[in-house]
């Protein structure tokens, strides 16, 4: 019981941070639709609140089957183009054209764009039962407007398990053929996390899954320094995954390198921590001091 409590405490700490100052709301695992791998309640809430005119067109087209009709169209587009494309370009279900995400305008002067940006709904859902075949659950799934963007498997060294166990769990116990875990069409990144280190992958591939460190580095070495948060890895949820940051990553930093001849060789590139940090510091410096210095 003590071990279980320590694991749950770690999970709750992440949830609390994202809910309290990360710009998220709490998702309900019962709203997760295993057939389509989306949070249908938040998906339709986002569409209706942010684009009522386009939603009305969908209702006129599909009638009483509007939700099912749109889910089928969404499924096809995600299968064909992928999650990153859908976030950036939206869904056309003629005559309706729906944005699935609104990115932050370059200037706060555009009040309409800013208002739409604020309509985004980021949510954190714990213990998501994702499979139609079994009752396996993932510790944490993050959603943007009901669409899954990231998973987290958490371990606490205080229980005798580390980030290596989280990686092993992804490789051995998480079937990449499951829709939520499928490359390109659903989650964009998967994090293996403990209280000391973070590792990531954009493509689950069984025992061949390749993880990259997502650590800050510690005095020129590997790992993470002691920070201001509760854990050495608190920067992940206190900084990287907070609302503005995650939406910015989806908009500007993730890159899908497709191999049309051999799709299995396609690669999703998610920035390492230091890459993200350097680019953002450079951009902030330009905004503050201008170019040409």
Annotate each predicted stretch with a short phrase:
Residues 2-293:
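ATP-dependent helicase/translocase motor core
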């Amino acid at each position: 019981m003590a071990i279980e409590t320590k694991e749950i405490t770690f999970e709750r700490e992440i949830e609390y941070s994202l809910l309290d100052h990360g710009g998220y709301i709490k998702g309900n695992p019962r709203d997760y639709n295993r057939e389509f791998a989306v949070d249908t309640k938040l998906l339709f809430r986002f569409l209706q609140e942010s684009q009522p005119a386009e939603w009305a067109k969908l209702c006129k087209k599909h009638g009483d089957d509007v939700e099912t009709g749109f889910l089928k169209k969404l499924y096809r587009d995600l299968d064909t183009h992928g999650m990153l494309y859908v976030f950036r370009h939206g869904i056309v279900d003629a005559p309706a054209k729906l944005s699935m995400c609104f990115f932050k305008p370059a200037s706060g002067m555009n009040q309409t764009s800013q208002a739409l940006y604020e309509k985004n709904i980021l949510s954190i859902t714990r213990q998501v039962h994702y499979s139609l075949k079994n009752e396996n659950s993932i510790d944490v799934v993050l959603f943007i407007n009901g669409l899954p963007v990231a998973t987290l498997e958490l371990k606490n060294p205080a229980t005798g398990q580390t980030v290596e166990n989280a990686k092993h769990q992804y490789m051995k116990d998480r079937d990449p053929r499951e829709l939520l875990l499928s490359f390109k069409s659903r989650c964009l990144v998967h994090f293996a996390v403990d209280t000391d280190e973070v590792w990531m992958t954009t493509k689950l591939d069984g025992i061949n899954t390749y993880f990259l460190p997502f650590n800050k580095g510690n005095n020129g070495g590997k790992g993470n320094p002691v920070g201001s948060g509760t854990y050495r890895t608190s920067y992940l949820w206190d900084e990287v995954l907070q609302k503005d940051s995650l939406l910015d990553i989806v908009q500007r930093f993730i890159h899908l390198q497709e191999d049309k001849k051999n799709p299995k060789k396609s690669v999703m590139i998610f920035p390492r921590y230091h890459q993200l940090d350097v680019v953002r510091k450079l951009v902030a410096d330009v905004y503050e001091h201008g170019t040409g210095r």
